[in-house]
Swiss-Prot record:
Its EC number is 3.1.3.5. InterPro entries: SurE (IPR030048), SurE-like_Pase/nucleotidase (IPR002828), SurE-like_sf (IPR036523). A divalent metal cation binds at D11, D12, S43, N101. It is found in: Cytoplasm. This is 5'-nucleotidase SurE. Nucleotidase that shows phosphatase activity on nucleoside 5'-monophosphates. It comes from Prochlorococcus marinus (strain MIT 9303). Gene3D superfamilies: Survival protein SurE-like phosphatase/nucleotidase. One of its GO terms (molecular function) is 5'-nucleotidase activity. The keyword Manganese does not apply. Its main location: cytoplasm. Keywords: Cytoplasm, Hydrolase, Metal-binding, Nucleotide-binding. The lineage of its organism: Bacteria, Bacillati, Cyanobacteriota, Cyanophyceae, Synechococcales.
Amino acid sequence: MTPLRILISNDDGVLAEGVRCLAAAAASRGHKVTVVCPDHERSATGHGLTIHTPIRAERVDELYGPGVTAWSCSGTPADCVKLALSELLAEKPDLVLSGVNHGPNLGTDVFCSGTVAAAMEGTLEGLPALAVSVACFQWRDFQAAAELAMDVAENALADNWPNNLLLNLNIPPCHPEQMGSLRWTRLSIRHYEEQFSRRVDPHSRTYFWLAGEVVKDLETAGDGPRDWPSDVAQIETNSPSLTPIQPDLFWRGDLSALPAACVANQPVR
């Protein structure tokens, strides 16, 4: 295919092996790659933006291989993409990629994900965008995930990539020969048992570490094709999951079920 201009970001930081592997995979296919990533890990920052302190960026091409321009940015993942599109790139990219994330981004966890937020920032700017994650925090072989992400992105661009569509790709922690087939999936709803570890610092001030674990994965976060598995169920079969996401969060349920009292007897203005 014609070489693409690709912007890559993440939330694990510019030194993370996952993003370096993804950048190398894109560059090896002849694409023009620019990496703009946080200067340190910014996991679970969601779509947060930096508005009260300056954002700084510096070139770090030496961290990446040939054909990759790289920037280290002091901001959040969403900041990185915003800054790249507004200030750092000479031309608008054809594609925004985010990842490869060191850990899953499944179900309603996408609302907390810096990885998904970086891709969503591209979607909000009218660009095709894909987030890619390996569904295990301990897995360190990102080559298969990077290559599959590139295959999915290139195929989607060659076929039909609708406006306002973000593709969220999760890949099981196994080698390609052990992996099942890629399928379209729906978002699950993840419920956690929230836990806070209470501690005391040397100045006798109490502080907390947030912890917790998934206690329940519901089948779906909303209506959708019934023959599509949830993303969590797909990963549990050692098969990659591809979930279409959009920025429009409008309620798609029964409008007659909305609490009518909210707007009853309100004066017309």
